[in-house]
């Protein structure tokens, strides 16, 4: 099995292998009480039950393995998911690629004024072009410096060692890795990295990876979307505010309009939590 799709200018996602399927999850769950495989519909219902009630061990019986080419700054976010096994291309042993990520103009935005780790909007096209050109010029200078440090035949000593020459490369430089993870933790990765709050570049990779895995475990993927990815979690304070709304207002639309009045009641929610609650109720 090999599925491949290009991502961005020089990257790609390849689904190299997958061990197990929906039936593997159901079989692993049923071994707890000694019953064998049942029908597909029974298996689907069981898988949905497992995901809904957070019985995660059976999902760990399925594993997926990818070959990825991605910018170093995206690789750093991927490596944060420590339950995965990975092996990365080595700049000590080999010469790094000349490929560097240059964002498309529609990806170039100013820093958000409300989110310290996100992008805003409203940047003019002229500034987008200037920023893109600066990124492109800087990566060209870095690659030129890298080539110089590596040396050539005219340098008697053969150039600087690879492990030090690579230090001038930008985090936009592309690297490659093999990445293997069980399905439970893969879904956790997808929930975080496909979220709108994640950096757009890691979102792009995560969405491609998920769409490749989805047809291989349709029941588990359906349950993930229903009970995890598209679900909404409520805190105790949010539930208190919601119960207040149901008792005090005829409908949710009226409650949202009058939410400022409800905010005067001490539910223990910060201003940001109030804003998040409104978004959940819309």
Regions flagged by a language model, labelled:
Residues 1-282:
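Family-specific signature for flavin-dependent thymidylate synthase
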